[in-house]
Amino acid sequence: NVEIGTPSTTVTWTVPTAIDASAVTTVSSHNPGQSFITGTTTTVVYTATDEFGNIGQCAFTITVTATDSIDPVVTVSSGFITQQVEIGLGGVNVFYTEPTATDNSGTAVLFSRSAQPGDFFPVGQTVVTYIFQDPSGNFGTGTFTVNVVEVDTTPPVVTVPNGIITRQVEIGTSGIIVFFSEPTATDNSGTAILDSRTHQPGDVFPVGQTIVTYTFRDPAGNPATGTFTINVVEVDTTPPVITVPTPSIITRQVEVGTPGVSVFYQEPTATDNSGTAILVSRTNQPGDVFPVGQTVVTYTFQDPSGNPASATVTINVVEVDTTPPVISVPSTFITRTVELGTPGVNVFYPEPTASDNSGTAILVTRTNQPGDFFSVGQTVVTYTFQDPTGNPATATVTINIVEEDTTPPTVNCINDVIRTVELGTTSAQVFYSEPTASDVGQATLISRTAQPGDSFPVGATVVTYIFGDNAGNIADPCVFTITVNTVDTTPPTVNCVSDVVRVVELGTTSLAVVYTEPTATDISGTASLV
């Protein structure tokens, strides 16, 4: 017997002996120490021959058998698995990587296990055993320990008597001593100890909000925090301070006979030691209509503590002549045309006039006058009139000098285009460089009867391009011809015949043979035998 997987082995044995009255010669098919293949049976034959040719034989078999005596090898990923549970739960479902096994036979099957992943394991240590078996019945065992430990991960529960405690102090006071009920804590362990606190009852707290933090811990070291706010508020008894913009008397003029006017002004503002002063009332506001004479406007402010303060602004409306002259412009836009390239022209036009409620309106300035030379483009002419009170009025006249374009575009036409296609083709897609045009202004393609990439039929097609400019001038048409010619480049198609075989009498040297001649077709309709 040999271990499974051993391909062969050497075998020894006691050599048979032969006894005879005369000398004996012995030969054998195999010899001790030879290698024999596993899984085979071999017959060994010994033959003994004496001097007279008498023969005696001895035969036996050698059988080499493979056997498996090696246990499977078990691999345990972790020999000790620890899982924590909260105190009082008793145990926990544990998932783990199961052991595996290998065997020299190539197969190791799980035979039994004392637990499996996902089972409930109690607090303490549990030994888990896995047994594997190979096809020969050899067993391999692997064990590991699941250790379930009770731990305390629950923090204490903190109780805060008040989330916010408010105390008042006189404005300008920096702070105050505050007494309060301290937070308490409970824990599932039965003990929660105060670990730290940022403040304690009787401390001085400054004006504003102070967050007080209490931290408790249980015997397992789990922390828990409770916070509350000490709010120290300043009390304000000082009214706001009002600032009235200078001047406090605001004067506006209105035209004589006008009952009043809408007046816009800068409003009073207020500051307060609290930082906030709110406008609570005003008898008027910017943009209101104020009558001729003096109107006292009262503004009242209040701080967050309700302290009021008032101030006044006087609006003084005075009648005056503020109406400017009324200008009449015969024509606000005057257009003259000049030939293209002419720099400008002298223009005569009717001048604006003016009237005023005082009866007098005098022309004081004008930037141009009739008969002046005006350049191509637009020139704004400004006229200014004034009444005896000095009220001015202005009007404008625009002189527009326009160049006229009467020259049509210059067209760069192209030569006729010739393309060839295969005989039988009815049309062809033709690409070509398009005609162009230039102009003193802007040349535009108005129309075209075809364009590059169009399909053109066999024969001649006349193509026309027409260009114009932005002045409406039309150039002579650009006319060229696109010719599509057909050519035949495809050879005829020959319908050949099969080889011809005829039989003649032995000794005959020739024979007249009749056969069907080959034929041919062509896309032109004619194929000639040459």
From Swiss-Prot:
Any one cellular-component term (Gene Ontology): extracellular region
InterPro entries: HYR_dom, Ig-like_fold
Pfam families per the UniProt record, alphabetical: HYR
PTM notes: Glycosylated.
Location, primary (coarse class): secreted
Superkingdom, taxonomy of origin: Eukaryota
UniProt KW keywords: Cell adhesion, Extracellular matrix, Glycoprotein, Repeat, Secreted
Disulfide bonds: none
Location in or out of the cell: Secreted, Extracellular space, Extracellular matrix
Function comment: Major constituent of the hyaline layer. The hyaline layer of echinoderm embryos is an extraembryonic matrix that functions as a substrate for cell adhesion through early development.
Subunit-structure text: Homooligomer in presence of calcium.
PANTHER family assigned: FI04643P-RELATED, HYALIN
Protein name as annotated: Hyalin
Annotated organism of origin: Lytechinus variegatus (Green sea urchin)
